[in-house]
Amino acid sequence: MASAALICGTEQWKALQAHVGAIQKTHLRDLMADADRCKAMTAEYEGIFLDYSRQQATGETMEKLLKLADAAKLKEKIEKMFKGEKINSTENRSVLHVALRAPRDAVINSDGVNVVPEVWSVKDKIKQFSETFRSGSWVGATGKPLTNVVSVGIGGSFLGPLFVHTALQTDPEAAECAKGRQLRFLANVDPVDVARSIKDLDPETTLVVVVSKTFTTAETMLNARTLKEWIVSSLGPQAVAKHMIAVSTNLKLVKEFGIDPNNAFAFWDWVGGRYSVCSAVGVLPLSLQYGFPIVQKFLEGASSIDNHFYSSSFEKNIPVLLGLLSVWNVSFLGYPARAILPYSQALEKLAPHIQQLSMESNGKGVSIDGAQLSFETGEIDFGEPGTNGQHSFYQLIHQGRVIPCDFIGVVKSQQPVYLKGETVSNHDELMSNFFAQPDALAYGKTPEQLHSEKVPENLIPHKTFKGNRPSLSLLLPTLSAYEVGQLLSIYEHRIAVQGFIWGINSFDQWGVELGKSLASQVRKQLHGTRMEGKPVEGFNHSTSSLLARYLAVKPSTPYDTTVLPKV
């Protein structure tokens, strides 16, 4: 395909390229002095407040970005997604995670069929099962109620549900509903992760949820077989049907594994793994822990942002504005990374989830039509809750590389603490930093200011902060299940907007396949050498040397012996 078909060939893209020089001559100190500009660079929806005035952008920049959105046919692409058109063209699939949280009476089609009734059928099944489970009516093989859940999955089957679970653990309403229960996640095939996931758990009171659409995911199924052995070795083979359930569409393999197909919960090809937290992948384990009503509030929060994203004008559309600013930072200003900085410990797993969501979605080098891109896409996402990150990597953000930052704050703490005699509450202390850091990045500190403070001359260069480092602030009113759902949906749609503008497919992930196929070759080699003494062959010198070193140490346990982890 000719490069002219790419977004970078449009007049709107070229206008932004020409605009970069003017922006590079400005400083955020000066831009922030314009109160009208600062007021204009905000958006609000249902109490969620976005302030992007500390971005290296002017009103003219935003006008040009909105024109770029029109050139990229952003509105049309959003409508196609919501209407169930197969915008994931490389896999010939619809992209309908919005249907997972749509109201019961909504109509969202895929292949001409409204998928919403089927979604609600699965949710109703989850609701019924979770109520039976939580009431104590569902008992294990020895007649004891099950109070522990281990969810086995990887990638999107793990990171999204873990983020939501971690955010809800300290929400008063959700925590009350979860009393006396444990939810753990097992993702890595490393046996250490198995050991940690079952440490201090009793198979008699534990339910294992195996999450694999095809029931063939290598890491997940090995972990599932390991936990099956853990259950069987303690309770016998008949216990599997009472202590293991599945989220899968492959009922044949589910049954062969020993799980009752009636206890398998479906999801669909139009749900990508990293977008699946609102499907049975997340809804089932979270409902077992917190009860379906809490999870439904989470889904309603996500749905509220879906409506905002679909209906609001781009000028005040939070996900659209965030997506456009990311395109500006990456493709025009040349910033390759983004720091996600929630000033809420409850959001400690947000950055890892967004890391997968963003980097797997937009880490592409060709257009949706297969044309090589001549511009950068995607960001390197990382982050840590404040104020922990301030004592970790903020040094680089302040005085090293320029990294745009997302500051996320919450007005009302989940767990307020105030000590008599203290100047401020614990939450106010946290939020003091939330409000200060964006200004520190924007304004910096000049040599003149340091001289006026009588700083020794030899320290002036070390204590100078250039400033002009972009950030945005997202302020949530509180952090209940509803707001957690809203935050998830904001980032999901922001990332989609970026992909729509860049003209890439944000909903496939071919980059994960090559490593898998090469690992299969290594797996055969390890088995052949361990069991039959076959020499290492068929690899390059480096890999052969590494394999030889690894295989030179015999395993502590023979391959024909079952050994389970002990911690």
Swiss-Prot record:
Cited InterPro entries: G6P_Isomerase, G6P_Isomerase_C, Phosphoglucose_isomerase_CS, SIS_dom_sf, SIS_PGI_1, SIS_PGI_2
Pathway: Carbohydrate degradation; glycolysis; D-glyceraldehyde 3-phosphate and glycerone phosphate from D-glucose: step 2/4
Localization per Swiss-Prot or TrEMBL: Cytoplasm
UniProt-annotated catalytic positions: E360, H391, K516
SUPFAM superfamilies named among the record's database cross-references: SIS domain (SSF53697)
GO biological process: gluconeogenesis; glucose 6-phosphate metabolic process; glycolytic process
One protein family per Pfam: PGI
Uppermost EC category: isomerase
Keyword Lipoprotein attributed: no
Keyword tRNA-binding found: no
Reaction catalysis annotation: alpha-D-glucose 6-phosphate = beta-D-fructose 6-phosphate
Coiled coil spans: none
Similarity comment text for this entry: Belongs to the GPI family.
Subunit structure, as described in the record: Homodimer.
Name of the protein in question: Glucose-6-phosphate isomerase, cytosolic
Lineage start: Eukaryota, Viridiplantae, Streptophyta, Embryophyta, Tracheophyta
Underlying gene: PHI1
